[in-house]
A protein has these predicted regions:
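Structured interaction patches on ligand/partner-binding surfaces of diverse proteins
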Residues: 17-28, 71-78, 97-130, 178-212
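Sequence/structural signature of beta-propeller domains
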Residues: 220-499
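Bacterial Sec-dependent N-terminal signal peptides
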Residues: 8-39, 499
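Short, ordered, surface-exposed loop/turn motifs in non-cytosolic proteins
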Residues: 42-66, 141-155
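Compositionally biased low-complexity segments at domain edges in trafficked proteins
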Residues: 122-150, 198-223, 248
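Short helix-loop boundary/capping segments
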Residues: 130, 134-182, 373, 377-400
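A short tyrosine-centered beta-strand micro-motif
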Residues: 85-95
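Short, solvent-exposed S/T- and G/P-enriched segments that are highly enriched in secreted/extracellular
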Residues: 69-83, 121, 148-164
């Protein structure tokens, strides 16, 4: 797909024509040319482009005569002046001298051929962009968005949009001002996998949370929708990735039931498994989530789709062993639910499945995946080895199936992640936010944000706070024969600036 920009040419000068002692009058007849458009291969965002102030466009006649160079202004549209050339076949070329890491203009390389045959001959130039572009569209008045990392740069303004051209594979962090506020949104953008052109649209105020790959803010400036950034696809061995933990600058993941009893260290930017650590004295019946204290990693073996398990457990591993050994030993915490009396198999039709857990103040907080009500029950357990009956604390009416949880180690913010199975827009991925977590209940009113749909991003499974309140998320493979085949992946959701 190409992007077509209507432009004109302004002729400032050319070299002399080649002398021919016996000219053919028909061949020497001149025609007037005007550039109609510039088409860039695979440039899809339909907004105005900004080029260098001038280009030196080279024209080479097929008869081998000396090239003609025209100095043109590619940003003017239209310009009435014409190029006068003799009839014939011409090759044209232009290439920007450099492609800066960040710039306010789009460097290009143009090449092609045209026939100069008729008066007022239209010419369409084609080429490729040498950099990529980001456009941010805000439907409210604001100061310019900023590139926050790896450099601090204001986005440039062009008509009603803000834009920046870049030539780097780095992960870019963008700060987008919230309306009438000192707060901001954080949007990540990965240079090496992003398309040539990307548009981020922010709408305010909105009450429609239908997911359209845009950011929608409600009247209180809370994001109804956010755009996750996929940073890698995971190896096939991680098709059933289920839980995440960020420890000492490393990302760890587990697979769920019927997989190995291993914790995997993942390179989030390549998706490769750096190493696998066996939990030698543990069995993976259905590992679902990870939680951590300052000294230990907890593995939740409490997946319970059928509702008939009597061996629910949590494994406790020393972080010092995890970071330095390829095989570790675990302590075991066994538990049951105080209100479960029926253990007959009841596939996905009960309230005793669990995929989410956090650690706080020597306690493990569990949040169930309630298949019937699409709410979650909040239980608490001691974090020491032993056999316990979990203590029921509260029910949270989320209207979704919960698959992961984590606590921000800095702010104490609690985030739950899951998806909606039912309703008018099924298979949506959601985040639920609480101000914090006490010993007996979650704190603050719930706020929620949609982050995508399963047919585009896979099943949401793991969540881990990264830095400055931003989060890693993982999704397991999603297959619908002949329709979808979404590989497992790691992504980032920018939350910095919201709290």
């Amino acid at each position: 797909m190409t992007f077509i920009l209507m432009v004109g040419l302004f002729v400032l000068g050319s070299c002399d024509k080649k002398n021919d002692p016996t000219p053919n009058p028909a061949e020497d007849e001149e025609v007037s040319l005007q550039i109609n458009s510039i088409s860039l291969q695979d440039w899809t965002v339909g907004s105005e482009l900004k080029f260098e102030e001038s280009w030196s466009l080279n024209l080479q006649h097929a008869d081998g005569s000396s090239p003609i160079t025209f100095l043109i202004n590619p940003n003017s549209s239209p310009i009435p002046e014409r190029i006068e050339v003799k009839k014939g076949t011409y090759r044209y070329s232009f290439e920007s001298a450099s492609a800066p890491t960040f710039s306010d203009y789009l460097p290009v390389k143009l090449a092609g051929e045209f026939e100069a045959e008729t008066p007022n001959q239209p010419v369409n130039l084609t080429g490729v962009a040498k950099s990529k572009g980001i456009v941010i569209q805000l439907d409210y008045d604001s100061s310019p968005p900023k590139l926050a990392e790896p450099q601090l740069i204001d986005f440039y303004s062009l008509n009603s949009d803000y834009y920046l051209y870049y030539n780097t594979a780095d992960l870019l962090k963008i700060s987008i001002p919230l309306p009438e506020s000192q707060g901001f949104l954080t949007q990540f953008h990965l240079g090496n996998t992003a398309p040539l052109s990307t548009r981020y649209q922010v709408a305010w105020p909105e009450n429609n949370d239908f997911y359209e790959n845009s950011i929608k803010l409600d009247e209180n400036k809370w994001p109804l929708t956010l755009i996750p950034t996929t940073v890698s696809h995971l190896e096939e061995s991680q098709n059933e990735t289920s839980g995440l933990a960020w420890i000492a600058g490393n990302l760890f993941s587990i697979n769920d039931g019927e997989n190995t009893n291993e914790i995997h260290q993942i390179d989030p930017f390549s998706g490769e498994v750096v190493r696998s650590i066996e939990v030698a004295n543990a069995t993976n019946v259905d590992w679902e989530d990870l939680a951590q204290s300052s000294t230990h990693l907890f593995i939740g073996d409490f997946g319970n789709n059928m509702g008939n398990r009597k061996d629910l457990s949590i494994y406790k591993v020393l972080i010092s062993d995890l970071l330095n050994q390829d095989a570790v030993q675990a302590e075991k915490i066994s538990f049951n639910y105080p209100n479960q009396t029926d253990f007959s198999p009841n596939n996905m039709n009960h309230e005793f499945d669990c995929e989410a857990m956090v650690f706080q103040n020597d306690k493990l907080h569990l949040f169930t995946k309630n298949w019937v009500s699409e709410s979650t029950d909040h239980y608490v357990l001691p974090s020491e080895k032993g056999n316990y009956t979990a203590e029921f604390l509260e029910n949270l009416p989320l209207t979704g199936l919960l698959t992961a949880a984590d606590l921000d180690p800095v702010s104490g913010q609690l985030i739950l992640m899951g998806f909606r199975r039912l309703g008018s827009n099924p298979l949506e991925q959601w985040l639920w936010f609480y101000r914090g977590l006490s010993e007996t209940h979650v704190q603050g009113e719930v706020r929620k944000t949609k982050i995508g749909i399963i047919p585009h991003r896979g099943f949401p499974e793991g969540i881990a706070f990264w830095e400055k309140g931003n989060i890693w998320i993982s999704s397991e493979r999603f297959v619908l024969e002949g329709v979808y085949n979404i590989p497992p992946q790691i992504g980032i959701v920018g939350l910095e600036g919201l709290f």
